[in-house]
Amino acid sequence: SHGVPIEINELALDADRLILTGGIIYHLLAGFGAGRKAVLPGISSYQTIQRNHCLCLRDEIGTGIKPEIVSGNLKTNLMHQDQMEHGAAADADFLVNVVANTHGQPAQFVCGHWEKAWLEGTKLVEKIYGVPINGLADCVIASSGGYPKDINLYQGVKTQDNAVKAVKPGGVVILVMELEDIHEPAEF
């Protein structure tokens, strides 16, 4: 319904059983990782992946990402909604996803129907990692939490995205990251 072609790997669709696996965590663009993301982008065509990611962008070129494309948002997130349509088209037989605790160890496995089990896992992510913001701050000091979350700017930008949501307009964000593997393009 979003104009993104449903092009899923035929090997997966022709298999006797399709079991989706992954780890559920906040996702910068899709709201949450895992679940339907095992289908799109997981086993979808390059064209489908690119078109799905374009749903994140504002209509006017150069104006960035739509404001509803944020971590934790599933209700108005077009990228997520499109991924759900692709997940339904794949008609997986089973899902096994894990939610890790703050030490990277399994807190809980969610298993069963690809959509229902995954949605239960997203609730646990909110419980473990969700932090209510009661007011915006003048200054936010944030850390990615160490390796591998701060290995490079590509990963570190996720911390920036969250920190900016907690600071007043015109406020200051101080990010603490090691950036051990910084090989991003200069413009990044």
Describe every region a protein language model picked out.
Residues D150-F188:
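C-terminal catalytic subdomain
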Residues V4-L136:
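Conserved, well-structured core segments that form the ligand-binding/active-site neighborhood
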Residues T122-L124, I128, G135-K158:
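Conserved AWS/pre-SET-to-SET junction and N-terminal core of the SET lysine methyltransferase domain
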